[in-house]
Amino acid sequence: MTRVPRGYIARRRRTKMRSFASNFRGAHLRLNRMITQQVRRAFVSSHRDRGRQKRDFRRLWITRINAATRVYNVFNSYSKLIHNLSKKELILNRKMLAQVAVSNPNNLYTISNKIRTIN
């Protein structure tokens, strides 16, 4: 079998992988085999953590809303607040409620009063 010189194609593939590894250190930046392993591992981690990030932020928002409702005695708990919001068909997502709870807690009172007055 004849030998095929793969100079340009192999170099292009390696430089592409090297561009992904530009912020790595040591052998992870210099050795081609190590670069491919670490870049593949980094892609796996980033793919996994994109899904995890959504869960983590939702947990953070729920924690902030729960803390604010308990401190300011809005509905005594997060679950009662969310239940009454859905029962009265007020459309506020958890991200917006958490932002209101952190930045301006007085607006939580207005939201709770609005929930109580709607029949």
From Swiss-Prot:
Keywords per UniProt: Chloroplast, Plastid, Ribonucleoprotein, Ribosomal protein, RNA-binding, rRNA-binding
UniProt keyword Nucleotide-binding present: no
GO MF annotation, one: structural constituent of ribosome
Record's subcellular location: Plastid, Chloroplast
SUPFAM superfamilies for the chain: Ribosomal protein L20 (SSF74731)
InterPro entries reported in the protein's UniProt record: Ribosomal_bL20, RIBOSOMAL_L20_CS, Ribosomal_protein_bL20_C
Gene Ontology process terms (BP): ribosomal large subunit assembly; translation
Gene Ontology annotations for the cellular component aspect, listed alphabetically: chloroplast; ribonucleoprotein complex; ribosome
Record carries keyword Ribonucleoprotein: yes
Family classification: Belongs to the bacterial ribosomal protein bL20 family.
Function: Binds directly to 23S ribosomal RNA and is necessary for the in vitro assembly process of the 50S ribosomal subunit. It is not involved in the protein synthesizing functions of that subunit.
Name assigned to this protein: Large ribosomal subunit protein bL20c
Organism, as annotated: Sorghum bicolor
UniProt lineage: Eukaryota, Viridiplantae, Streptophyta, Embryophyta, Tracheophyta
